């Protein structure tokens, strides 16, 4: 009574019906029925602005518009063509011109060309994080995860991993349950990190004309892979058990602090650019050497020079190379005899059931283990050598043009712009039997879900603190990526035509095994929860 008298006139009880602005917004964005559709729409808009159709083509993507400029002007006219012109004017040796222009600048330029898209994407994600929306997504995902025996704590490393997989893996330390922590370490890198964005941008841009749904689907495929893997792993003895409790405070919605947003965007973008200036430069030099040198008919040297010697490259030898590569004789190129082609061609057989069993995407995939940026850098180097110049045609008569010596006049191609990515698309279409888009999508899925770069693998080893668990994680990631890509390619061909019966049966068996693991009873977890 005495306390009540003291509080009277000082304390005013808030009415039950009064809701804050954040509460009113949360009634919609965290609604059990509307939360996921709203999240899907938000992410679609994020990727539409960063990786969709360019504003120059009637779309809304600022990132793609800037990336097109970067590829054509920065990568092509300035870095590759500019450096070549300067070096040739100085009288530099051809091999040095090739190393710097076709190797270093072509590889680094191909990667840096996608920086504008990444910066726009990081800016959008930082805005969502700073305004308080992404915290709600963690709350929503916890509600969904818990239904499948997973913890919402696993979603936090996933959010961190959108910038880089290494801090994402390290963020799993906040999970107390050892089994949940190990499972999170294994699956966090499924989410597309900054280094994987150029791969998404390449496939969405080169094969799908800047399609927004391709880029958006890559993000949700990563989330789906985490959820599906979590459910399957939770039903094994190694990971069974009740999920760790997840408690977090939801901040009130607020206007983003631009200082924080720009700082976060810059930090993520700068870490990517630094890698391009270190790891990518070194890797580009190695890839240039492997694609430039090789053994041609028993002679070792630069393959371009050796192929100009008719005494070395005879018709019989071209027939042998064509048979080895599985291509027509008129499509044989100097690079088919390079060291990289010789090594990657046998390995490419492994990826034939996935739709991209050619040595070039195989080489790009394998080098992607060093750094995921290397996938695009590798394409930039290989297709910079492989620019298909066509014979010039008289615009009035339509006749082929020749010079005074009777040699065909070839049209000039952009060395590191749209032409390279058009050649990538043409090759995917060729080696997949006319199913280039499906093969490229399968290629993208595999490279998004397979083992991460060496640096992230090192982080996994530190967090696992076990060589056995590290190899298990790498094996699971590569195996899961292979199976999903196999299913996508084989079932996709069922609808696009030209299906392979054996491949289709194998894909259906894999799909059935995944469904069985997903829906089988959760016995081990029930035992643990009762005890």
Predicted feature residues:
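Switch/coupling subdomain of P-loop NTPase systems
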Residues: 1-19, 24-26
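Core alpha-helical transmembrane segments of integral membrane proteins
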Residues: 28-135
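Hydrophobic core segments of alpha-helical transmembrane domains in multi-pass membrane transport
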Residues: 38-49, 121-126, 204-206, 219-234, ...
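Extended, low-charge hydrophobic alpha-helical regions
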Residues: 56-94, 98-103, 148, 169-181, ...
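Juxtamembrane inter-helical linkers in multi-pass membrane proteins
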Residues: 73, 135-165, 239-264, 383-404, ...
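Conserved phosphate-handling catalytic cores of large alpha/beta enzymes
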Residues: 167-244, 380
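Transmembrane helix-loop junctions at the membrane interface of multipass transporters and ion channels
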Residues: 190, 194-216, 458-463, 483-501
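Membrane-interface capping segments at transmembrane-helix boundaries
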Residues: 516-530
């Amino acid at each position: 009574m005495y306390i009540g008298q003291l509080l009277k006139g000082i304390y005013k009880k808030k009415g039950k019906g009064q809701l804050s602005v954040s509460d009113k917004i949360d009634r919609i964005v965290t609604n059990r029925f509307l939360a996921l559709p709203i999240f899907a729409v938000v992410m679609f808009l994020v990727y539409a602005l960063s990786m969709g159709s360019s504003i120059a083509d009637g779309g809304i993507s600022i990132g793609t518009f800037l990336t097109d400029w970067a590829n054509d002007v920065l990568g092509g006219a300035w870095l590759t063509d500019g450096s070549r012109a300067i070096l040739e004017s100085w009288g530099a040796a051809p091999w040095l011109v090739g190393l710097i222009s076709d190797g270093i600048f072509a590889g680094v330029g191909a990667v840096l060309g996608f920086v504008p898209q990444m910066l726009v994407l990081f800016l959008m994600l930082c805005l969502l994080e700073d305004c308080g929306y992404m915290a709600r997504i963690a709350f929503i995902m916890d509600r969904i995860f818990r239904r499948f025996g997973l913890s919402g704590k696993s979603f936090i490393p996933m959010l961190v991993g959108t910038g880089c997989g290494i801090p994402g893996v390290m963020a799993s330390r906040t999970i107390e349950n050892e089994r949940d922590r190990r499972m999170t370490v294994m699956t966090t890198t499924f989410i597309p990190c900054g280094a994987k964005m150029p791969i998404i941008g390449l496939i969405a841009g080169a094969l799908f004309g800047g399609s927004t749904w391709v880029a958006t689907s890559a993000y949700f495929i990563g989330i789906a892979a985490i959820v599906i893997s979590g459910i399957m792993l939770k039903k094994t003895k190694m990971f069974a058990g009740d999920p760790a409790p997840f408690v977090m405070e939801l901040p009130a919605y607020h206007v983003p602090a631009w200082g924080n947003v720009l700082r976060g965007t810059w930090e993520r973008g700068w870490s990517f650019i630094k890698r391009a200036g270190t790891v990518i430069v070194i890797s580009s030099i190695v890839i240039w050497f492997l694609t430039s040198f090789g053994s041609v008919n028993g002679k070792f040297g630069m393959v371009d020079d050796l192929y100009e010697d008719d005494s070395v490259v005879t018709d019989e030898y071209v027939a042998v190379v064509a048979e080895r590569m599985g291509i027509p004789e008129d499509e044989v190129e100097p690079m088919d005899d390079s060291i990289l082609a010789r090594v990657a061609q046998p390995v490419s057989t492994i990826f034939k059931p996935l739709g991209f069993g050619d040595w070039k995407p195989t080489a790009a995939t394998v080098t992607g283990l060093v750094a995921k940026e290397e996938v695009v850098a590798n394409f930039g180097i290989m297709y910079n050598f492989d620019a298909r110049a066509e014979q010039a045609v008289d615009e009035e008569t339509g006749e082929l043009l020749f010079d005074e010596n009777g040699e065909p006049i070839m049209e000039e191609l952009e060395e590191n712009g749209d032409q390279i990515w058009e050649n990538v698309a043409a090759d995917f279409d060729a080696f997949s039997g006319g199913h280039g888009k499906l093969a490229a999508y399968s290629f993208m899925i595999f490279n998004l879900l397979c083992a991460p770069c060496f640096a992230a693998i090192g982080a996994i080893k530190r967090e696992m603190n076990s060589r056995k668990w590290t190899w298990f994680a790498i094996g699971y990631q590569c195996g899961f990526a292979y199976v999903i890509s196999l299913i996508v390619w084989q079932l996709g061909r069922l609808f696009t035509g030209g299906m392979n019966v054996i491949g289709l049966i194998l894909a259906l068996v894999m799909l059935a095994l995944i469904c069985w693991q997903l829906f089988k009873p959760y016995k081990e977890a029930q035992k643990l929860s009762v005890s």
